[in-house]
């Protein structure tokens, strides 16, 4: 298997997807999202609020160096990131169980269209004001008792949907 160098990755074409983390508290989750973002060659990862930023040992432990390949940026809050992305022509989707949310299996992304997905805090989810600023909500259908998943697992499922 041929792997890209960090430099080759930075120059390679990207999936037109920005992942926005809204106050994700676990550095291990942040690192896992970096690693999955590298695997799916996303455009960027926006770390907002209390979401940790590199360099951090805990991020590196799960990212395995993907924090060096995936473009990232920090915002004081996710609302700033959402407003910027919308101004740049992205369709911004909160990944959250909301009234009127679209089930992920029913959502068909338009190839080549720029999207951003907002994933929320492990306990509180996406802040209400951020959800309100998004164009729509996506929901992963679930059948268990918890009706929630780890944010890094959710990120992987969502990224896969936009690539394939």
Residue ranges and their predicted role:
Residues 1-164:
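Post-transcriptional modification and biogenesis factors for structured RNAs
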